[in-house]
Protein backbone atom coordinates (compact mmCIF):
# COMPACT_ATOMS: atom_id res chain seq x y z
CA UNK A 1 0.00 0.00 0.00
CA UNK A 2 1.28 3.48 -0.87
CA UNK A 3 0.89 6.06 1.92
CA UNK A 4 1.55 9.78 2.02
CA UNK A 5 1.60 12.15 4.96
CA UNK A 6 2.11 15.78 5.98
CA UNK A 7 1.87 15.18 9.74
CA UNK A 8 3.27 17.40 12.52
CA UNK A 9 3.26 17.33 16.34
CA UNK A 10 -0.24 17.46 17.81
CA UNK A 11 -1.01 20.09 20.43
CA UNK A 12 -4.47 20.51 21.91
CA UNK A 13 -5.62 22.96 24.53
CA UNK A 14 -8.92 23.29 26.35
CA UNK A 15 -9.50 26.48 28.31
CA UNK A 16 -12.59 27.42 30.30
CA UNK A 17 -13.17 30.71 32.10
CA UNK A 18 -15.97 31.29 34.55
CA UNK A 19 -17.59 34.44 35.82
CA UNK A 20 -18.89 34.58 39.43
CA UNK A 21 -20.26 31.21 40.54
CA UNK A 22 -21.50 29.64 43.75
CA UNK A 23 -18.87 28.12 46.03
CA UNK A 24 -18.77 24.36 45.72
CA UNK A 25 -20.14 22.05 48.40
CA UNK A 26 -20.75 18.40 47.62
CA UNK A 27 -22.27 15.61 49.67
CA UNK A 28 -20.69 13.04 47.32
CA UNK A 29 -17.03 13.87 47.89
CA UNK A 30 -15.84 14.37 51.46
CA UNK A 31 -12.68 16.21 52.53
CA UNK A 32 -9.62 14.04 53.06
CA UNK A 33 -8.85 13.24 56.71
CA UNK A 34 -6.90 16.08 58.22
CA UNK A 35 -7.70 18.37 55.30
CA UNK A 36 -8.28 21.96 56.38
CA UNK A 37 -9.46 25.02 54.46
CA UNK A 38 -6.49 26.71 52.80
CA UNK A 39 -5.28 29.96 54.37
CA UNK A 40 -5.84 33.11 52.31
CA UNK A 41 -2.68 33.70 50.27
CA UNK A 42 -0.75 36.92 50.41
CA UNK A 43 -0.52 39.13 47.35
CA UNK A 44 3.09 38.08 46.76
CA UNK A 45 2.00 34.41 46.89
CA UNK A 46 -0.58 34.44 44.14
CA UNK A 47 0.64 31.15 42.68
CA UNK A 48 0.38 29.30 46.01
CA UNK A 49 -1.12 25.81 45.93
CA UNK A 50 -4.42 25.64 47.79
CA UNK A 51 -4.86 21.89 48.24
CA UNK A 52 -2.42 19.31 49.52
CA UNK A 53 -4.20 16.47 47.67
CA UNK A 54 -1.87 14.51 45.38
CA UNK A 55 -2.84 13.04 42.02
CA UNK A 56 -3.58 9.42 42.91
CA UNK A 57 -4.35 6.32 40.89
CA UNK A 58 -7.96 5.25 41.45
CA UNK A 59 -8.96 1.90 42.86
CA UNK A 60 -9.81 -0.60 40.13
CA UNK A 61 -12.41 0.85 37.74
CA UNK A 62 -14.69 -1.82 36.19
CA UNK A 63 -14.21 -2.38 32.47
CA UNK A 64 -17.93 -1.75 31.88
CA UNK A 65 -17.61 1.71 33.45
CA UNK A 66 -14.61 2.59 31.26
CA UNK A 67 -16.46 1.32 28.19
CA UNK A 68 -19.49 3.49 28.99
CA UNK A 69 -17.29 6.54 29.50
CA UNK A 70 -15.43 5.90 26.22
CA UNK A 71 -18.68 5.41 24.28
CA UNK A 72 -20.06 8.67 25.61
CA UNK A 73 -16.85 10.51 24.77
CA UNK A 74 -16.99 9.14 21.21
CA UNK A 75 -20.57 10.38 20.84
CA UNK A 76 -19.48 13.78 22.18
CA UNK A 77 -16.60 13.84 19.68
CA UNK A 78 -19.04 13.46 16.78
CA UNK A 79 -21.44 16.03 18.29
CA UNK A 80 -18.61 18.52 18.62
CA UNK A 81 -17.28 17.83 15.13
CA UNK A 82 -20.68 18.58 13.63
CA UNK A 83 -20.75 21.86 15.56
CA UNK A 84 -17.28 23.09 14.56
CA UNK A 85 -16.83 21.64 11.07
CA UNK A 86 -18.61 24.61 9.47
CA UNK A 87 -15.55 26.80 10.00
CA UNK A 88 -13.16 26.98 7.07
CA UNK A 89 -9.71 25.42 7.19
CA UNK A 90 -8.29 22.38 8.93
CA UNK A 91 -9.05 21.64 12.55
CA UNK A 92 -7.56 19.59 15.36
CA UNK A 93 -9.34 18.96 18.62
CA UNK A 94 -9.16 16.56 21.54
CA UNK A 95 -12.59 15.45 22.81
CA UNK A 96 -10.99 13.73 25.81
CA UNK A 97 -9.16 16.93 26.78
CA UNK A 98 -12.33 18.99 26.50
CA UNK A 99 -14.29 16.42 28.50
CA UNK A 100 -11.61 16.42 31.19
CA UNK A 101 -11.55 20.20 31.49
CA UNK A 102 -15.34 20.53 31.65
CA UNK A 103 -15.56 17.59 34.07
CA UNK A 104 -13.59 19.71 36.53
CA UNK A 105 -16.48 22.19 36.40
CA UNK A 106 -19.04 19.40 36.42
CA UNK A 107 -17.65 18.21 39.76
CA UNK A 108 -18.95 21.40 41.34
CA UNK A 109 -22.22 21.66 39.42
CA UNK A 110 -25.65 20.70 40.71
CA UNK A 111 -29.24 21.00 39.53
CA UNK A 112 -29.94 22.31 36.04
CA UNK A 113 -26.29 23.21 35.39
CA UNK A 114 -25.23 19.65 36.19
CA UNK A 115 -27.91 18.24 33.89
CA UNK A 116 -27.01 20.49 30.97
CA UNK A 117 -23.29 19.68 31.19
CA UNK A 118 -24.06 15.96 31.34
CA UNK A 119 -26.33 16.20 28.29
CA UNK A 120 -23.84 18.23 26.24
CA UNK A 121 -20.81 16.07 27.01
CA UNK A 122 -22.68 12.76 26.99
CA UNK A 123 -21.84 12.02 30.64
CA UNK A 124 -24.05 9.06 31.58
CA UNK A 125 -22.15 7.91 34.67
CA UNK A 126 -22.90 9.16 38.16
CA UNK A 127 -20.35 11.68 39.43
CA UNK A 128 -18.80 9.22 41.87
CA UNK A 129 -18.10 6.90 38.90
CA UNK A 130 -17.28 9.47 36.22
CA UNK A 131 -14.33 11.20 37.86
CA UNK A 132 -12.41 8.04 38.87
CA UNK A 133 -13.00 6.66 35.35
CA UNK A 134 -11.61 9.83 33.74
CA UNK A 135 -8.65 9.61 36.10
CA UNK A 136 -8.01 5.98 35.12
CA UNK A 137 -8.06 6.78 31.39
CA UNK A 138 -5.85 9.82 31.84
CA UNK A 139 -3.27 7.90 33.87
CA UNK A 140 -3.29 5.11 31.29
CA UNK A 141 -2.39 7.62 28.58
CA UNK A 142 0.07 9.64 30.65
CA UNK A 143 1.19 7.66 33.72
CA UNK A 144 3.04 9.50 36.52
CA UNK A 145 6.80 9.21 36.20
CA UNK A 146 7.67 7.31 39.44
CA UNK A 147 7.61 3.63 38.52
CA UNK A 148 5.99 4.27 35.15
CA UNK A 149 7.11 2.34 32.06
CA UNK A 150 9.86 4.10 30.16
CA UNK A 151 8.37 5.57 26.93
CA UNK A 152 9.74 4.48 23.60
CA UNK A 153 12.50 6.73 22.21
CA UNK A 154 10.98 9.38 19.99
CA UNK A 155 7.71 9.39 21.93
CA UNK A 156 6.31 12.31 23.93
CA UNK A 157 2.85 12.59 25.46
CA UNK A 158 2.07 15.10 28.17
CA UNK A 159 -1.39 15.70 29.66
CA UNK A 160 -1.63 18.48 32.23
CA UNK A 161 -4.50 20.18 34.05
CA UNK A 162 -4.45 23.43 35.97
CA UNK A 163 -6.98 25.55 37.81
CA UNK A 164 -6.65 29.23 38.60
CA UNK A 165 -8.92 30.95 41.12
CA UNK A 166 -9.60 34.49 42.28
CA UNK A 167 -7.46 35.20 45.34
CA UNK A 168 -10.33 36.19 47.66
CA UNK A 169 -13.03 33.78 46.44
CA UNK A 170 -14.28 31.14 48.97
CA UNK A 171 -13.63 27.88 47.10
CA UNK A 172 -14.50 24.82 49.17
CA UNK A 173 -11.74 22.44 50.29
CA UNK A 174 -13.58 19.23 49.18
CA UNK A 175 -13.75 20.62 45.65
CA UNK A 176 -10.06 21.53 45.60
CA UNK A 177 -9.15 18.11 47.01
CA UNK A 178 -11.17 16.38 44.29
CA UNK A 179 -9.37 18.34 41.56
CA UNK A 180 -5.97 17.50 43.04
CA UNK A 181 -6.73 13.85 43.75
CA UNK A 182 -8.56 13.00 40.50
CA UNK A 183 -7.17 15.44 37.93
CA UNK A 184 -3.80 16.41 39.36
CA UNK A 185 -4.91 20.05 39.09
CA UNK A 186 -3.40 22.21 41.81
CA UNK A 187 -5.14 25.56 42.14
CA UNK A 188 -3.04 28.68 41.81
CA UNK A 189 -4.25 32.00 43.18
CA UNK A 190 -4.53 34.92 40.78
CA UNK A 191 -5.94 38.40 41.10
CA UNK A 192 -8.04 38.78 37.96
CA UNK A 193 -8.32 42.51 38.62
CA UNK A 194 -4.84 42.47 37.09
CA UNK A 195 -6.02 40.69 33.96
CA UNK A 196 -2.75 41.19 32.08
CA UNK A 197 -0.57 39.54 34.74
CA UNK A 198 -3.11 36.73 35.18
CA UNK A 199 -3.09 36.12 31.43
CA UNK A 200 0.71 35.98 31.33
CA UNK A 201 0.86 33.55 34.27
CA UNK A 202 -1.56 31.10 32.64
CA UNK A 203 0.05 31.45 29.22
CA UNK A 204 3.46 30.70 30.75
CA UNK A 205 2.03 27.51 32.27
CA UNK A 206 0.59 26.43 28.92
CA UNK A 207 3.85 27.22 27.13
CA UNK A 208 5.80 25.14 29.63
CA UNK A 209 3.46 22.15 29.27
CA UNK A 210 3.55 22.23 25.45
CA UNK A 211 7.33 22.59 25.11
CA UNK A 212 6.91 26.20 24.03
CA UNK A 213 4.66 25.44 21.07
CA UNK A 214 1.72 27.48 22.42
CA UNK A 215 2.76 30.74 24.04
CA UNK A 216 -0.29 32.99 23.69
CA UNK A 217 -3.34 30.85 24.39
CA UNK A 218 -5.31 33.51 26.24
CA UNK A 219 -5.59 36.66 24.18
CA UNK A 220 -5.98 40.11 25.72
CA UNK A 221 -9.58 40.81 26.71
CA UNK A 222 -10.62 37.24 27.57
CA UNK A 223 -9.98 37.66 31.29
CA UNK A 224 -11.71 40.46 33.21
CA UNK A 225 -11.96 41.60 36.82
CA UNK A 226 -15.22 39.56 37.02
CA UNK A 227 -13.46 36.25 36.23
CA UNK A 228 -13.40 33.89 39.19
CA UNK A 229 -12.09 30.58 37.86
CA UNK A 230 -10.01 29.43 34.89
CA UNK A 231 -9.52 25.76 34.05
CA UNK A 232 -6.87 24.72 31.54
CA UNK A 233 -6.06 21.35 30.00
CA UNK A 234 -3.02 20.92 27.78
CA UNK A 235 -2.05 17.93 25.64
CA UNK A 236 1.25 17.65 23.79
CA UNK A 237 1.86 14.63 21.56
CA UNK A 238 4.78 13.82 19.29
CA UNK A 239 5.84 10.34 18.23
CA UNK A 240 7.85 8.47 15.64
CA UNK A 241 6.23 6.01 13.28
CA UNK A 242 6.86 2.31 13.81
CA UNK A 243 7.92 2.23 10.15
CA UNK A 244 9.44 5.61 9.26
CA UNK A 245 8.69 7.40 6.02
CA UNK A 246 11.55 7.88 3.59
CA UNK A 247 13.33 11.22 3.78
CA UNK A 248 12.20 12.16 0.30
CA UNK A 249 9.71 15.01 0.66
CA UNK A 250 8.29 16.27 -2.62
CA UNK A 251 5.43 18.35 -3.91
CA UNK A 252 2.26 16.33 -4.54
CA UNK A 253 -1.40 17.16 -5.33
CA UNK A 254 -3.84 17.07 -2.42
CA UNK A 255 -7.63 17.38 -2.52
CA UNK A 256 -9.32 19.14 0.44
CA UNK A 257 -12.99 18.66 1.23
CA UNK A 258 -14.05 21.33 -1.27
CA UNK A 259 -12.69 19.20 -4.13
CA UNK A 260 -10.13 21.75 -5.27
CA UNK A 261 -6.59 20.58 -5.93
CA UNK A 262 -3.72 22.12 -3.97
CA UNK A 263 -0.02 21.29 -3.95
CA UNK A 264 1.58 20.35 -0.62
CA UNK A 265 4.83 18.80 0.62
CA UNK A 266 4.43 15.05 1.16
CA UNK A 267 6.41 11.95 2.09
CA UNK A 268 5.48 8.44 1.02
CA UNK A 269 6.14 4.78 1.70
CA UNK A 270 4.92 1.33 0.72
CA UNK A 271 4.05 -0.94 3.62
CA UNK A 272 1.76 -3.60 4.99
CA UNK A 273 -0.69 -2.02 7.40
CA UNK A 274 -4.19 -2.32 8.78
CA UNK A 275 -6.79 -1.53 6.12
CA UNK A 276 -10.57 -1.46 6.06
CA UNK A 277 -13.41 -0.18 3.93
CA UNK A 278 -17.13 0.41 4.02
CA UNK A 279 -19.90 2.18 2.17
CA UNK A 280 -18.27 5.30 0.77
CA UNK A 281 -14.92 5.20 2.56
CA UNK A 282 -11.54 3.51 3.00
CA UNK A 283 -9.41 3.55 6.16
CA UNK A 284 -5.84 2.70 7.15
CA UNK A 285 -4.15 2.34 10.52
CA UNK A 286 -0.62 3.65 11.08
CA UNK A 287 1.32 2.43 14.11
CA UNK A 288 3.64 4.51 16.26
CA UNK A 289 6.72 3.10 17.98
CA UNK A 290 4.82 3.15 21.26
CA UNK A 291 2.42 0.24 20.80
CA UNK A 292 -0.36 2.03 22.73
CA UNK A 293 -0.71 4.67 20.03
CA UNK A 294 -2.10 4.31 16.53
CA UNK A 295 -3.47 6.72 13.95
CA UNK A 296 -6.55 5.86 11.93
CA UNK A 297 -6.99 7.77 8.66
CA UNK A 298 -10.37 7.71 6.92
CA UNK A 299 -10.69 8.62 3.23
CA UNK A 300 -14.22 9.28 1.93
CA UNK A 301 -15.00 8.32 -1.66
CA UNK A 302 -14.16 11.03 -4.17
CA UNK A 303 -16.75 13.80 -4.27
CA UNK A 304 -18.64 12.58 -1.16
CA UNK A 305 -16.85 14.47 1.63
CA UNK A 306 -19.86 16.52 2.78
CA UNK A 307 -22.16 13.51 2.59
CA UNK A 308 -19.68 11.50 4.64
CA UNK A 309 -19.49 14.28 7.26
CA UNK A 310 -23.26 14.30 7.63
CA UNK A 311 -23.23 10.54 8.24
CA UNK A 312 -20.99 10.82 11.30
Give the location of each predicted region.
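Non-catalytic, conformational "gating/processing" segments within enzyme and secreted inhibitor domains
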Residues: 34-40, 44-48, 88, 127-303
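Detector for small/aliphatic-rich hydrophobic stretches
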Residues: 2-12, 16-192
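Mature, solvent-exposed C-terminal subdomains and processed small-chain segments of exported/organellar
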Residues: 301-312
